[in-house]
Structures are given as structure tokens and as C-alpha cells.
Amino acid sequence: LEEILDEVMEAGDRALLFTQFAEWGKLLQDYLQRRWRSEVPFLSGSTSKSERQAMVDRFQEDPRGPQLFLLSLKAGGVGLNLTRASHVFHIDRWWNPAVENQATDRAYRIGQTNRVMVHKFITSGSVEEKIDRMIREKSRLAEDIIGSGEDWLGGLEMGQLKELVSLEDNQS
């Protein structure tokens, strides 16, 4: 993490760092601020609405604003536009890929002009590795069942489509 963040900082890029644990986020915030001697805001569920907006505005709009923005996965996963980021880090994995994808999407919004690199950290031989395997299997299963996007719907025959959208008479 440090090596990649060194590169991010040296390039003048900005990064989002997501963690699912608020307590870990506080520890990480303290460490990152000491390590790079710069502000690293931490947005969690306990962040007030006004503080939250101030953090987002400073990260997004201030040329001298923070390069690193630490967010709890749940609090930072929805309703934010953070297109200033060109890197997204998932520090610890969440079992539900949709939650991680929503968080990653904070950087992929209308107005994004940067290429965004997504980094997911996994400790070898740990529960995280097992969670990652589960996530990949769930994603593969979802892909096999419904396909990618809306393409699966176009592959249905007319009879299958009619059956899908028709009401059933269950009064027998």
C-alpha cells in the first residue's frame, strides 16, 4: 500500500481508500497523516452532513486539497461524486461485491476524465482470501445466470419473453 501511495502522491494524483471498519479507518487515518505529513480526511457514518460536504468539496475542488480520502465502505459507498480520484483502494474486502462496486463507482461518475485504477488488497492465506474467492464465484455465477448488462434480455425468444412478463393464474 505504501509503495503504491508513494507513486500516487509523487504523481500528484488523488485516491480514495475504502475500509469496512470505522475503528480501523481511524487508525489508518492517523498513520497516513503521520506518514505523508498531510491531511487525510476520514468520512464515516458518524460524519455530519455539513462535514461530509466540506470534505467532498475540498477533495474535489481545492487544488491544494488532500490527495488521499479515506472512507468507510458503507458511508462512502453511495451518493458521492468523487471524480477527482484516479485511484480507488479497497483496504479490506467486503463479502458483497455490489457494495464494493458501489463504492468504486464514486470515482466513475459523470465528469470523470481520469483513468481510474482500482486496487484490492488481500492478505494471502487469510479470511480475506476466502472472501475474495467467494466474491469472484458470486460474480461469475451472476454473469452466468443473467449475463452482462441487459444483453441477456435480448437473447430471449418471443415465447420466453411473453412468459416472463405475463401474470400467472394461481387460482387452481
Where are these regions (language model features)?
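ASCE P-loop NTPase motor core, strongest for the SF2 helicase catalytic module
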Residues: L1-S172
